[in-house]
Each structure stands twice: as C-alpha cells, then as structure tokens.
Amino acid sequence: MKLCFFLLIFIRSFLLFKIKLVRTSEKKWRMGSRSHGDVKHPKSLPSLPVIGSLLHLGKKLPPHILFCNLQKKYGSLYSFMMGSHYVVVVNNHEDAREVLLKKGKTFGGRPRTVTTDILTRDGKDIAFADYSPTWKFHRKMVHSALCMFGEGTVAIEQIISREAASLCQTLTSFQRIPLDMAPELIRAVTNVVCSLCFNTRYKRGDAEFETMLKYSKGIVDTVAKDSLVDIFPWLQIFPNKDLDILRQSVAARDQLLQKKINEHKDAFCGETVKDLVDALLKAKLNMENNNSNVSQDVGLTEDHILMTVGDIFGAGVETTSTVLKWAVAYLLHYPEVQKKIQEELDVKVGFGRYPLLSDRKILHYTEAAISEVLRIRPVSPLLIPHVALKESSIGEYTIPKEARVVINLWSLHHDEKEWVNPHLFSPDRFLDENGNRVYSPSPSFLPFGAGIRVCLGEALAKMEVFLFLSWILQRFTLEVPEGDPLPDLEGKFGVVIQVKPFKVIAKLREVWKNIEIVT
C-alpha cells in the first residue's frame, strides 16, 4: 500500500511537471548550451525531467571535491539542475569576487528550503534570510549591537582569556593522559558565546549546558545530511525521522533562547548593557525610536532577535571549535610548526604574562599558521548558496533570475594557479621574505566569504582562535599518544568539514613547570 501511495504521489508530481515541460525544456536547452544567439550560458551537466542532474552528482565524493573535479570537463564555471533548481558553481576567485563583491546585492538572495525554514523560523535570521529591507535593517541592528558590546573590546578579550585559562587547567589535569580535546574545545567556545550573549558561563555537567550541547548536536547532525526533501519539498508528506529530530532540536533551542530573552527583557532598564542580548534589545529600541516608520515597514520582530542569537550559537560554536580542532590536528602532523610558534611566543610574549589580542601584530608566524589552517581546511568549503535576484552575468556568461550560485571555497583555496603545492600545509606562504605577516597572499583566500554576506562573526572567530591556540601552545606541547595513528586529515563533509575523533597528550613544557603568573 505504501509503495502504491508513493507511486501515485510521484505520478501526480510528474504530471504537474509535464504542464511546464515545454517551457522548462526550452529553458534547460538554452542553459545547457554554451551559447544561444547573443546569450551565453555556462556549460551544463546533463539533465533529466524532474530529477535534473542528480544522476551525475551521485558519486561517492564530498560535494566540494566533486565540484572541484568537474572543472576538468566543464570549466571553472558550470551549471546543473538540482531537481527544478538551476545551480551555478563558481570555482575561481575572479568569478567569486564578482558574485560576492562587485555584484553582491544582485546575488544577495538565499534559497528557501524546508530545512532552513525550520531552522530559522521561515528566514528570520541573518545567515539564511533573503536579501530585503528587513534583512538590511536586521543586519544593521546586529552590527550596532556588536559595536555596543564591542568586537575587540577589553570585555570580549577577558571572556575569551578566562575560558582559555580554564581550558589550560583542564589540560594540566590530564597531563600525559590521552585526551579527546574536541569536547573541551567545544565547551570553551560555547562558554565564550554564552558569556557574550547571556553574561553566563557553565561548568561541566550543568543541565542547561548539556541541553545546549544536545540540541546543537541534533541540529548539526540532521542539517549535515543530504536531504531530498530540500530538493523535492512535497516529500514532506512522508514520515521523515531526520526532520522530526530537527524540529525537536530546534524547539528545544528556541525554548531555551526564549527563556533567556524573557529574563533579559524583564531586567532590561534601557541603559545598562551587560551582554549581547541587552545590546540587541537596546539597538532595536534605539532604531525604533529613531526610525519608527522604517522599523514598522520592515517588520522586525522578537523572532529576529531570537534567530540572531540562534545564528551566533549555530555558526559561532560549530565553526570556531572546528577550526581549533583542525589546527590541533595539523600541529600534530607538523611538530616543526608547533615548535616555531612556541619559539615565537617565548621571544615575543615571554614567560611573565599570557598572550593578549594586541600580540597579534607581533606574532606573525602564529597568525600565519592560523591563516594556513583556514586555507587548507576551510570550515565551510561551500559557502551558503546565493540566489540571483535578477538576471545578471558572471564573467562572460548570462545568469538567469533565481539561479542558485554556489561558491566552492575549496577550489579557491586549493587552486594550483594561486597556491604553490596547495595540498601542503605551509604557514610560510602567509609571510614575506622578512618574516612579516602577509594577510592575503592571493585573492583566492576568502575563508569567511566577502561582501554584504560576509560572516558577521569573523572578528570574534579570529580572536578566539588566536587566544585559545596561543595560550595552549605557550604552556603545552601537543603530541600523539604512543601507539595511536596521526589524526585523519580527510575530514567528513557536513555543515562544516568535521575532524574525525583523535586523542592528544598535552605535556606541560619544561620551562613552565615552575612558573606561576599572577593575573
């Protein structure tokens, strides 16, 4: 019976599709051609009715690797049909910068999917929301809040340093004992975000903290899976375990975040700003008072504040902790890099204090190593897809309205035309001949995206990665436990490129065994 029901649904959908078949076939023929009259479209993968190019995308390769490999046959800019959606893949920095910077507003849209609608209350966040007056007002409000509760201020540095100290205490207690650092790094980064957003931090075993970890894992695990329901939304009528888990996890997240926001609203006096939620409430209040007509027109609601905090947790914790895990993995593979970072810390910071954010301008090799981690293992190898809000072009090719544009950051960061031996981990590529920091040795280096859709948390992420790594390496040498293999550097594609689990031995450096710093 279930099979018959499925067939009936499929036939119904196919017949509905046939109504538009002539128009769609003509459109796909034009898109699949290199040129048609005066219009030139990117070369396209073969496509079939209903399923599009799915049969040609089903190889057992992660999407970023598959898209990179397809360049050999289709060029650095090509297209395919994902069901009924026209998708363009960008694999070079010239086209990527045109999309992100030169034509950022034109390609500023976001695709609506079943999964992201559940995750964002129908697009009320910043990362996945479509480009619109509401989105612009929302982003401006968040930027105002971040400035108010300052990126780069003493407050944020103190928060990160406190968690770095706590992390170092944990490593000290596990000296010479194999430790999976992943949970500790996640805990440290999560506490930074909790302190930033709610003026709260959690200890191990705290029930509320464990709830956060549980729903975060549920969201990450389900969103990471290839979901046919995002290609064929009508599949929602069938039981879907992953969607059920996602809905449950999002409900748990929203319940906790709403509780925190309500507590802040009750205590908020309009003047004192203790954390980011207070800053968001004040920024929203200020903008409504100063631009009452604008705020009413854009329809900014409390849901937008809740989703902003959800964005910060969802993106801020997963991405930053993953960068740190990759950094540790590569330092284990390249102990000479770890040693050079430690030597730089010894000379330029010394043993009488801990690293500060202001040291970034003198710790050139440390910063270069972090940049190389971001290059060789971009946390988000495929940036969140963009959508063309009107017909436009990329290079010499015409791009139709509503086309989805995917920037393959992996290809940009491993382009042999831009990087010498791109698969080799080499911090020196971010240094000049005098050992000074080169911030962007190639226009292909775009770890946080660019333009109007650039990651809002870029500054915070860079601060966290720098302070956590420099604090750890100042005091400890990281080694692979005896008999264990080196960490796997392939990773697993998902919401981010996940590091496969591995263990570390953190040895307190000899010079630090008799040193105590008064903070």
From Swiss-Prot:
It is found in: Membrane. GO terms for molecular function: heme binding; iron ion binding; lyase activity; steroid 17-alpha-monooxygenase activity. The keyword Acyltransferase does not apply. Belongs to the cytochrome P450 family. Coiled coil: none annotated. Conversion of pregnenolone and progesterone to their 17-alpha-hydroxylated products and subsequently to dehydroepiandrosterone (DHEA) and androstenedione. Catalyzes both the 17-alpha-hydroxylation and the 17,20-lyase reaction. PANTHER family: STEROID 17-ALPHA-HYDROXYLASE/17,20 LYASE (PTHR24289), STEROID 17-ALPHA-HYDROXYLASE_17,20 LYASE (PTHR24289:SF13). This is Steroid 17-alpha-hydroxylase/17,20 lyase. The gene is CYP17A1. Pathway: Lipid metabolism; steroid biosynthesis. Keywords: Heme, Iron, Lipid metabolism, Lyase, Membrane, Metal-binding, Monooxygenase, Oxidoreductase, Steroidogenesis. Signal peptide: none annotated. Its cofactor is heme. Gene3D superfamilies: Cytochrome P450 (1.10.630.10). Heme binds at C455. Its main location: membrane. It is an enzyme of class 1 (oxidoreductase). It comes from the Eukaryota. It catalyses: a C21-steroid + reduced [NADPH--hemoprotein reductase] + O2 = a 17alpha-hydroxy-C21-steroid + oxidized [NADPH--hemoprotein reductase] + H2O + H(+); 17alpha-hydroxyprogesterone + reduced [NADPH--hemoprotein reductase] + O2 = androst-4-ene-3,17-dione + acetate + oxidized [NADPH--hemoprotein reductase] + H2O + 2 H(+); 17alpha-hydroxypregnenolone + reduced [NADPH--hemoprotein reductase] + O2 = 3beta-hydroxyandrost-5-en-17-one + acetate + oxidized [NADPH--hemoprotein reductase] + H2O + 2 H(+). Its EC number is 1.14.14.19, 1.14.14.32. One of its GO terms (cellular component) is membrane.
